[in-house]
Amino acid sequence: MFENILTKIFGSKNERDLKRLQPLVAHIGSLESELETLSEEQLAGKTVEFRQRLAEGASLDSLLPEAFAVVREAGKRVLGMRHFDVQLIGGMVLHKGKIAEMKTGEGKTLVATLAAYLNALPAKGVHVITVNDYLASRDAEWMGRIHRYLGLTVGCIVHGLDDRQRKEAYACDITYGTNNEFGFDYLRDNMKFSLDDYVQRPLSYAIVDEVDSILIDEARTPLIISGPSESSSELYYSVNRIIPMLEKGETIESRDGRVGQTVREYTGDFTIDEKAKTASLTEDGVAKVERLLGVENLYDPGNIELLHHVNQALKAHALFKRDVDYVVKDGEVMIVDEFTGRLMPGRRWSDGLHQAVEAKEGVKIESENQTLATITFQNYFRMYDKLAGMTGTADTEATEFNQIYSLDVMVIPTNRPLARKDEGDVIYKTNREKFLAVVEDIIERHAGGQPILVGTISIENSEVLSSMLRKRGVPHNVLNAKHHEREAEIVAQAGRKGAVTIATNMAGRGTDIILGGNPDLLAQRESAGAENPEAALAQALVKYQEVCAQEKQDVLAAGGLYILGTERHESRRIDNQLRGRAGRQGDPGASRFYLSLEDDLLRIFGSHRVAYIMDRLKIPEGEPIEHRFISKAIANAQKKVEAHNFDIRKHLIEYDDVMNTQRNVIYAQRREVLGGEQLPETFAAIIDEMVEDIVATFCPEKSAPEDWGWASLNEDFFSQFNMPPAPLEVPASDLTPTVMLEHLKQQVDARLQEREAEFTPPVMLHLMKVLLLQTIDAQWKDHLLSIDHLKEGIGLRGYAQRNPKEEYKREAYELFLQMMGRIRQEVVQKLFRIQLAKEQDVERMEQRQRRHRISLNRAGGEAEAAKPVVRDEKKVGRNDPCPCGSGLKYKKCCGQ
């Protein structure tokens, strides 16, 4: 209450922050008339002037008013678009490294040009990050015209570019692209064999469009680069055949009065926990699986892989639904993005889940992949020196943005007052009643000429509704993952008179719905294929400008765009995004959600008391329910899910921070090796450490030389350095561990100098680099697999009254130290065994690594497996001597 009184007197923090920016807005406005008089060359020359002033010590903050005024003037000249005052405020918020919450239709894309231009002046590179390739290409071309007009270079990173094109795009002042491409390029760079092959520059400043989608919705999905593993696909088919024979059971909870605790009993062969999204075998189920597969004990350590396959197959059948979680298209299982409803070609679920779904659907099973490099978006974006973002809905997640990314959210006022009317939820008892009511509402509003955007949460629901409308003769468009090709066109025309558009989730984000329709797109569609396209386009444009202007008046009279949600999402933010499609730039509009007690949100997270009250109210079929208690139950259910998902994301980053530290160490070492300047010193230090370890192990400080482990010392020394220890001409009384250490070091140093003389210093340096990189990469790959196994079982430590997170940190650190030890051991063994070879043999070793193409993957999804490398030279067998001349088998050397 006290806080409310203070807010009324002094205004909220957001209002006070906005007030502080008003003088800057006025300053920018005062420069407008002066800049209007400048010629094209003079305006573009301002960029050179600003860069000169920066070089002389000026700060970006001091240049902000002039830079923003220059961008505003360029926008007027190039695009015919003038930045509103609220857009200038949005640009300032982005420059300060904060999140600007701006409602749909307020021109977020144009806002980004202000902060991007200002922060591009130091020439360190600005990344503008969007959610898909279409928006990245569109914005790079559309908004890039402003930047190019002012003398800046603009690049665009989309799927399918080669390394040369990517490097050119990253070298530009401003680079547009998707979050996936930026993240994968970072991982790929850290697998390169030359610094010249790196495509990215150091990460300086990023503006993330739809920041909530990328930093929150996608945060639980790590980026993964993977290569093929050696697992067989046959086991997936074998296990898949038995899953349909299992019967789904229930969890029955009862109260044990003697101990005062809840007791759970399980029926059937497996049970499903929809809240946790897990499926588990019951005791009867385990016995049945053992009988069907012909194994004695499914939980025997020897059957651990089989158990994993059974669990994944059970999950594929019980939890993953066709046309909801995935679609089958052209003989492939394609994931559907749960937040946008878009298909995600190339992405695959990890841990064999994707293969289990492929077996379930009877399509070809792609080989399972092994992780070679991975990072979460959370840790990737935290590497930027400065990070900012834009979205229409961030305030509900302000705490998470602050805690995880240290980003504050500022709500930017709309240019015109919001005129949308958000009506109360209408709740029905069953899905059937709900959809019948939805159809009646659509028919009534369609007859009145009001455009309607219907939001569904799955492809299945959108097609059910489409079928019902077709039967009633209502013309409509369906926009879901199956019909995504026409997305921009369908969304752009969703504001036409009487238009009915059914869209899964937030498909179409980034394209404004213009009341009356978009004359440009209509004209382009009509003139396509004409004999004289330019003349046809001009003629069609005049026609459709008149048509759309008239339709806009009719639509405004009918009440503007009507948003009809058919189910609440787990997150209030996603619901707000759907509502936000109506009421852009002060236009009228309305929104309403139709719900049923069979909706997943209420069924899984809603209180059982809701259904009880429904029965007591005796509501007749087809009648909606409006009850304060039920509305409150919906709000509570959403808050529960949001809190649950926040905990998962927080939990994920705490675990990933451990890997992040290790990843930074490995990637920093790779960069040092690629620099190559300190390589001889690095190898000398590694060799000294190894000799010290041997002496410390077999020549204890307080024991007599005759008690030393001479046989083991000789064996270990030979294993490492490919030579026996030289005889030591020293009386036994003078022999100490220190004397032994110096003797062995001198012997190894002498042999190393001989090797360098054999190879010549340049070849030796090159060889050291290749050996180190090759060994680091192979060991890091194995380490990632070990960490995956550690993660899988770490939760069980809780049963031993141990903190799983602390145990994970400790064991991950031990695994890391073991990996570093193996790297040292392997590179030294190879260096002392490698035979004198021609310089081109060493080059060939490096070329073989370069040619090894790795498939890109995303867990949440992994992409398809890497194709075999096409070799120019004769293929080497795994057990043949390695052609590099090390003396080792190929599989133990370059074939790792």
Swiss-Prot record:
Residues 858-886 are annotated as: Disordered. It catalyses: ATP + H2O + cellular proteinSide 1 = ADP + phosphate + cellular proteinSide 2. It comes from the Bacteria. GO terms for cellular component: cell envelope Sec protein transport complex; cytosol; plasma membrane. The keyword S-adenosyl-L-methionine does not apply. Its cofactor is Zn(2+). ATP binds at residues 87, 105-109, 512. Residues 869-878 have a biased composition (Basic and acidic residues). GO terms for biological process: intracellular protein transmembrane transport; protein import; protein targeting; protein transport by the Sec complex. Part of the Sec protein translocase complex. Interacts with the SecYEG preprotein conducting channel. Has a central role in coupling the hydrolysis of ATP to the transfer of proteins into and across the cell membrane, serving as an ATP-driven molecular motor driving the stepwise translocation of polypeptide chains across the membrane. PANTHER family: CHLOROPLAST PROTEIN-TRANSPORTING ATPASE, SECA INNER MEMBRANE COMPONENT OF SEC PROTEIN SECRETION SYSTEM. Belongs to the SecA family. This is Protein translocase subunit SecA. The gene is secA.
